[in-house]
Amino acid sequence: MCNEPATSDVALPDLDWAKGDGLLPVIVQDADTLRVLMLGYMNSQALEVTQRSRLVTFYSRSKQRLWTKGERSGHVLHLVAIDADCDADTLLVQARPRGPTCHLGRTSCFPAAPGQFLGALDALVAERERERPQDSYTTALFEQGVRRIAQKVGEEGVETALAGVVQVDDALLDESADLLYHLIVLLRARGLSLADAVTVLEARHR
């Protein structure tokens, strides 16, 4: 099945509020692409409001009050899961953003790291699988079924190997891109995600 982040909460007494004078740093991550969106701070009340409303809410150190992300712009963060780190003094929030997170109109307050596009592509393919927009090549693949998608992966794999053998770098890069795309579509067609495959790689690395 898809490696969908499970909705989870953390217990207030289990967190080390004393270390940060009642505040914990909060890293917000896109639940679908896994891209880091922003950094904020929560006190215990902000955490309680976040868990109750399912809208990510912070404590503003400058205004000395709670503020819900997007309370003016409408670009809210819908809570998916909250986890604490091993020292219980930092929170990781997984959320689904409605609109850009950064006040400058950007997706994230941080620049995109190399390789993050694959996560965004995986999320886009998942969206295509759910919504099935017309005139979309991805939609056409899903409607043809797993067997046809698997056939395309095989074809692209052979073409990638041949491009490597003839040592034409541009062709190898083009075919590799096609292979990665069709592999992501195949994973989604089977109810899996790119993150599931990465988890297997990580387990092997250990």
Curated annotation (Swiss-Prot):
CDD domains linked to this entry: NTP-PPase_HisIE_like
Pfam families hit by this protein: PRA-CH, PRA-PH
Record's protein name: Histidine biosynthesis bifunctional protein HisIE
Enzyme class: hydrolase
Region (Phosphoribosyl-AMP cyclohydrolase): 1-117
GO biological process: one example: L-histidine biosynthetic process
Cystine residue pairs: none
Species this protein is from: Xylella fastidiosa (strain 9a5c)
Record InterPro entries: His_synth_HisIE (IPR023019), HisE (IPR008179), PRib-ATP_PPHydrolase-like (IPR021130), PRib_AMP_CycHydrolase_dom (IPR002496), PRib_AMP_CycHydrolase_sf (IPR038019)
Keywords: Amino-acid biosynthesis, ATP-binding, Cytoplasm, Histidine biosynthesis, Hydrolase, Multifunctional enzyme, Nucleotide-binding
Family indicated by similarity: In the N-terminal section; belongs to the PRA-CH family.
HAMAP family: HisE, HisIE
Pathway: Amino-acid biosynthesis; L-histidine biosynthesis; L-histidine from 5-phospho-alpha-D-ribose 1-diphosphate: step 2/9; Amino-acid biosynthesis; L-histidine biosynthesis; L-histidine from 5-phospho-alpha-D-ribose 1-diphosphate: step 3/9
Region ranges (Phosphoribosyl-ATP pyrophosphohydrolase): 118-206
UniProt-annotated location(s): Cytoplasm
EC code(s) of this entry: 3.5.4.19, 3.6.1.31
Catalytic reaction(s) noted: 1-(5-phospho-beta-D-ribosyl)-ATP + H2O = 1-(5-phospho-beta-D-ribosyl)-5'-AMP + diphosphate + H(+); 1-(5-phospho-beta-D-ribosyl)-5'-AMP + H2O = 1-(5-phospho-beta-D-ribosyl)-5-[(5-phospho-beta-D-ribosylamino)methylideneamino]imidazole-4-carboxamide
Main location class: cytoplasm
Gene Ontology CC annotations of this record: cytoplasm
MF terms (GO), sorted A to Z: ATP binding; phosphoribosyl-AMP cyclohydrolase activity; phosphoribosyl-ATP diphosphatase activity
